[in-house]
Amino acid sequence: MKIGKFKIGKPNVFVIAEIGNNHNGSLQLALEMVDAAIDAGADCVKFQMRNMASVYRKKSLDKQGEDLGTEYILDLLQRFQLSTDEHREVAEYCTSKGILYMCTPWDSSSVDTLEKFKIPAYKVASADLTNLPLIDHLVTTKKPLILSTGMSTESEIQVTVDFLNKREASYVLLHCNSTYPAPFHDINLNW
């Protein structure tokens, strides 16, 4: 599989610097993190985009969620995301610096927004490995997909693999452990 100018697979390693939402909603910090990724030798930087109204229930977004944990997390997600224009600026900055910009869309409307950026590939979060409607929407872009498998059972992974194969999608699975730091007995790199 190819992503941009990079051929993915043996013997080549494709290094993705996971920025996610660690920029805390600051465009300046996001750009500084891109520079740090370049200095570290990364091939790609990866961000996240979500349309909060598409992903979360209105009740939760209106601060009427059933628990404080949900309210706390949603508040952080809202405060720590970049706007569409800021994502576009980061993508353009990456192009000017010679590093690939990639993003994890959490919903179909984010996919549609990101398609305007002409990004080379999409990353699917572990939490969305079984979100077949989202994956189907991503497949229609004809872009390569990198899908994380954290928290998924072998049968869930197989369902998604069969789904992608049936659609002749270009994809790779990214072995992912969703516990940080991961206990050695959970690493399972030989699967």
Residue ranges and their predicted role:
Residues 1-191:
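Catalytic cores and adjacent flexible loops of soluble metabolic enzymes
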